[in-house]
Amino acid sequence: MIDPIEQFHLNKIFTIGHIGNQEIAFTTSSAYMLLAVVLIAAMMLGAGRALVPGRFQSVVELAYEFVANTIRTSAGSHGMTFFPLVFSLFMFIFVSNIVGIIPYTFTVSSHIIVTFSLALLVFLTVIIYGFYKNGLKFFKLFVPSGIPAVILPLVVIIEIISFFSRPISHSVRLFANMLAGHVTLKVFASFVTMLGALGFVGKVGALLPLGLTVALTGLELMVAFLQAYVFTILTCIYLNDAIHPGH
């Protein structure tokens, strides 16, 4: 059977430079992240501002309204301050996920270093803006209202641990779902290849895993959107803590 993990291996395209003894390389992951950015930029530039929107403009406007409504629902009107960040994260993750479904491509979001970097960006934004806007009142985030004084110290400790574990849970959720989905697809696709090599009987038997592969591909398209949405809505919820730490 073809190794289902092989698709996640990083291949060096060229060396950018060195920091000490550490090589800095432009890899397949770098290439597909750049591709996602180029595709998003092309979509934005090609959308136009026509009174009667075309296809690209309709897609961009739909994405804009979707993200804007998500922010308003989760973080209120003040959350629109972060629209450029949230919209960029949603589009980058969604486009990267869609590109990764195409055979023989690379799934950027299946690497924990990528998803953790995005989650860490959100985490640091929450901390920096939280202190910038609220000062020391930001610490109210760790002291929920209405908690009895007897158990308050325990609750504060739990809240602090929960807060600092956010980048881990935020990143692992996206990484694990994309990794598991692509491994499953690869396994069923390899069954098709193996059975197809066994002659007529094998080709007939390959119809079942082929059908499952097609069905799973459709499911992965839905997962590609759902995971981008989940990452986005969690980002909005976390940003709401920076805007309204006492709520």
From Swiss-Prot:
One of its GO terms (molecular function) is proton-transporting ATP synthase activity, rotational mechanism. Its main location: membrane. It is a multi-pass membrane protein. InterPro entries: ATP_synth_F0_asu (IPR000568), ATP_synth_F0_asu_AS (IPR023011), ATP_synth_F0_asu_bact/mt (IPR045083), F0_ATP_A_sf (IPR035908). Disulfide bonds: none annotated. GO terms for cellular component: plasma membrane; proton-transporting ATP synthase complex. Keywords: ATP synthesis, Cell inner membrane, Cell membrane, CF(0), Hydrogen ion transport, Ion transport, Membrane, Transmembrane, Transmembrane helix, Transport. The keyword Methyltransferase does not apply. Belongs to the ATPase A chain family. PANTHER family: ATP SYNTHASE SUBUNIT A (PTHR11410:SF0). NCBIfam families: ATP_synt_6_or_A, PRK05815.2-4. F-type ATPases have 2 components, CF(1) - the catalytic core - and CF(0) - the membrane proton channel. CF(1) has five subunits: alpha(3), beta(3), gamma(1), delta(1), epsilon(1). CF(0) has four main subunits: a, b, b' and c. Key component of the proton channel; it plays a direct role in the translocation of protons across the membrane. This is ATP synthase subunit a.
